[in-house]
Amino acid sequence: VKSVKRTEFLAACVAAIALVFAAYAGSLDNSFHFDDSHVIENNLYIRSLDHVPQYFTDAHTFSSLPQNATYRPLVTLSLALDYARGGLRPRPYHVTQIALLLLTGALLVLFFTSITGELPALFAATLFCVHTANTETMNLISARSELLSAIGLLASFVLYQRSQLARRSSLYLVPLAIGALAKAPVVVFAPLLFAYALLIEKKSPRQALRIALPSLLLGIALLVFLNNMNAKEWESGGGSAWSYLITQPFVWLHYARLFVLPVGLTADSDWTAFAHWYDTRAVAGYAFIALLILAIRRAPAPVAFGLTWFAVALLPTSLFPLAEVANEHRIFFAFIGLVLAAATYVRTRWLAVAATLFLCVHAFATHERNQIWRNEETLWADVVAKSPANGRAWMNYGLTQMAKGEYADAKRNFQHAATLVPNYATLEINLGVVEGELGDDAAAERHFRRALALHPDVSAHLFYARWLTRRGRAPEALPHAREAMRRSPASAEARALVSRLEVAIGGAGSQTWPNYKSAFEAGLEALRNRDWSTAIEANRAALSRDPRSADAWNNLGWSLAQLGFRDESVRAYRKGLEIRPDDQRLANNLRLIAPAP
């Protein structure tokens, strides 16, 4: 494309921004998904900016699940800022996602312009921003790590390109180091810079290595630091390293296909690692890698650099086994290379027109794909249709039915999931919950106990404690609730349950009422709603203002009894009888709890 006037280019930039907004405007109220539950919804540490210093010293602040507590303080900080603006309403988080995407696009334009020229660079950046396969990264708020780390790496490239001072002083590495606080794979900057110097700047291999050496040393130091900062409980979740490795070439082929034709997108694949190196799919993957290497060797320099970027970006998640062999948010960073390669060929006006139409098609497809991410039910209905062998997907779809009160349907989905993942502790927890809702307490308890036997993590202890509490067995629940909180201090649910149970046995409450009357009436309302924990807290507050209220002692005793705190209930009734010895209601309630011998 011939050079364009500045006003025309700025108009094209405005149009590109409008296209990105059009693609993602419908996602603003999409709900939280996947890891968002423990990174955002149940994470106490994002609820106050007072915790900001702790984000940078303790990986447990990233997630309420210790096994997911990886060191990503920049992500946690950004989420805390979103929470400060809107609590747990999804919209502020999605607004930030779109803002970060636009910033990524702006950096891509700056980075690519010196390689391809302005309009091809703008096309590449816009394609990246509206590409339908990137919808997972945009809708999965906890995947913000991909956005932030990409921004850090791109900013380093732009500084390297455009500032002699930054290049001579190595200040271009500062954004890279900051981006590493969002996600470790930014350490691939060194091989990318080597490729850039070799292919784009036409340096010799020795010169390119000398240029990349400072970033290589920084990358190694960052990797060591980040690994040491991860919580000791953190788990990557990977299985056999060999099986995982021989599967990845086919996964790369799949990712490349998604770039060309993003159909069949699924939020949770049912793929598993290949058992044999000679699996037909594995062989197809090897052939793809060979063709990729051949293309890098023969393609024009910008295309070769883009293809190299694609390969290098995928190496960290390909060499180190992870829980899933393929994930669509892993392609976000890798696709930067592919959009560069594609844009290199947009050199004529007719191709520019075709490229514009192509962008509009992608924007429309992205808008439609965002509707799948509208809520948990729409998402998991899509996943079970596209990944029917995924037991976790069937379980999560069952959870959406349980949330609607469709317990029988939820149980059927859970039971189907059990045929696919028979020893999945989280599934056992959910079977326990649904059996409890269906009234089969014996079956519910079996499932909760099996979950504890399979994996006694915070969720197993917490959900068993909640069930025990609701069954009037709070004294048994309290040790499990405390264990859940010990394992995960960041868990809002565990902390809230422990607080309620400890208030029941005389601990300090968190709620305040201005006087006896308001506290007593709040206790009555809680009794009517069968909210025993609140009733206990309110009546204890009332008694702190009027310890001679026999009615408050009676209501406290009744609430304690419903939770199973028998001894505490007896003491409350006896206190009431000391005040009003002839109160027949107090006497009758006491006999129900402690009948005369």
Q: What are the residue ranges of the model-derived segments?
A:
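Position-specific recognition of the canonical hydrophobic site in helix A of tetratricopeptide repeat
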Residues: 402, 429, 436, 469, ...
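Helix-start (N-cap) detector for alpha-helical repeat units in TPR-like alpha-solenoids
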Residues: 391-392, 425-426, 458-459, 492-493, ...
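Polytopic membrane enzymes that build or remodel cell-surface glycoconjugates and lipids
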Residues: 1-439, 456-459
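Short coil turns that delineate tetratricopeptide repeat
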Residues: 388, 422, 455-456, 489, ...
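Residue-level recognition of tetratricopeptide repeat
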Residues: 399, 433, 466-467, 500, ...
